[in-house]
């Protein structure tokens, strides 16, 4: 099966062309889920991948059913590693690497000095977290190849992503010499290089998330960080067409009941009215999605990938594999898990619902 593909994206080599993919989005839109799906897609494409969290929420350990993630890089699935970056571990590693002062860790922990420093120096905590991402990006294996082909970071939400990424620039303005200044400068170079890092912004096709996504994209561009694609999450699959909606509306509750009776079935007046209300609500949701997708892509001029709304009572790894395959299918790659969950018509309808036909950044 081949789904319609957004302009500017041709396969995983394009989507995952940057070494580091920072996934951000307004809280509650599913950025963590999207980050996990992207990581699984990376593994499916043959890339050694590490999935990184920086906010200490342990979302991935719960989702994948592993022990708590910490500062150690552990392979928890074939080809997929995970770690949780902690500012304290980052600063202890930094002190040991540049000054040989790992012995001060005990003193800092007892005196709560680290809490004082990170509070007194705005941006330092973000710099420590981002510094470890930079460290992962430059790591090499013994044969000179990168330790990881792909680094997927569940980044801070859109309300914090710019200060998070801006932290190296802020530090270089304060610290003019020394290893901190040099490393901050190197981190800034990584952020400005699209081959090394890009941001993927996740949104729901709802009013507030779309507006915040547009603002975040513009702010990231002003910062000089590569952005794209966008991901529309929890897209409602259109199951009733506009002509079908109009036909049912013209029939009305009594007409629908009469038609059902002619076909040899029975339907109460209450049930027929409920059905009409459900159809109207569904079509209203679909049409709202269409309007907001055009606003989103038109304002950002970026390709848009879609992830369908999943109706599972619990969200587990097989669901993530389905979403990873939905991404794959939109890029012309194989997606067996998605095709086992959705039929071709449902998948195409979900993708089409988030694919603008006339505005810049999309294709029919």
Predicted feature descriptions by range:
Residues 304-306, 314-356:
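C-terminal accessory extensions appended to soluble enzyme cores
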Residues 26:
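P-loop (Walker A) phosphate-binding loop of NTP-binding proteins
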Residues 95-101, 242-247, 318-327:
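Short, surface-exposed amphipathic charged segments that create phosphate/polyanion-binding patches used
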Residues 97-137:
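ATP-hydrolysis module of ASCE/P-loop NTPase motor domains
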Residues 40-110:
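N-terminal phosphate/diphosphate-binding loop that engages ATP/GTP or pyrophosphate donors
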């Amino acid at each position: 099966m081949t789904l319609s593909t957004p302009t500017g994206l041709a396969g995983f080599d394009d989507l995952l062309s940057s070494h580091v993919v920072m996934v951000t989005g307004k809280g509650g839109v599913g950025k963590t889920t999207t980050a996990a799906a992207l990581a699984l897609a990376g593994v499916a494409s043959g890339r050694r991948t590490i999935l990184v969290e920086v906010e200490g929420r342990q979302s991935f350990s719960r989702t994948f059913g592993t022990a708590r993630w910490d500062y150690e890089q552990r392979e928890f699935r074939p080809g997929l590693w995970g770690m949780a970056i902690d500012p304290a571990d980052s600063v202890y590693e930094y002190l040991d690497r540049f000054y040989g002062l790992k012995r001060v860790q005990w003193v800092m922990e007892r005196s709560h000095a680290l809490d004082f420093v990170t509070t007194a120096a705005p941006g330092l905590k973000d710099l420590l977290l981002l510094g470890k991402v930079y460290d992962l990006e430059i790591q090499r294996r013994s044969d000179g190849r990168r330790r990881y082909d792909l680094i997927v970071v569940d980044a801070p939400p859109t309300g914090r992503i710019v200060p998070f990424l801006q932290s190296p620039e802020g530090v270089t303005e304060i610290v003019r010499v020394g290893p901190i200044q040099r490393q901050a400068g190197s981190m800034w170079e990584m952020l400005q290089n699209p081959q090394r890092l890009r941001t993927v912004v996740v949104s729901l096709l709802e009013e507030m998330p779309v507006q915040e996504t547009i603002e975040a994209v513009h702010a990231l561009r002003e910062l000089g960080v590569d952005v794209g694609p966008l991901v529309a999450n929890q897209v409602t699959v259109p199951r009733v067409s506009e002509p079908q909606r109009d036909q049912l509306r013209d029939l009305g509750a009594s007409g629908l009941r009469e038609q059902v009776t002619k076909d040899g079935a029975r339907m109460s007046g209450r049930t027929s009215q409920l059905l009409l209300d459900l159809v109207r609500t569904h079509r209203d949701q679909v049409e709202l999605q269409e309007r907001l997708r055009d606003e989103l892509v038109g304002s950002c001029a970026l390709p848009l990938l879609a992830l369908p709304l999943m109706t599972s009572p619990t969200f587990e790894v097989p669901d993530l594999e389905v979403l990873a395959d939905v991404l794959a299918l939109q890029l012309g790659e194989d997606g067996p898990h998605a095709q086992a969950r959705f039929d071709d018509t449902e998948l195409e309808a979900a993708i089409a619902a988030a694919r603008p036909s006339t505005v810049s950044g999309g294709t029919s």
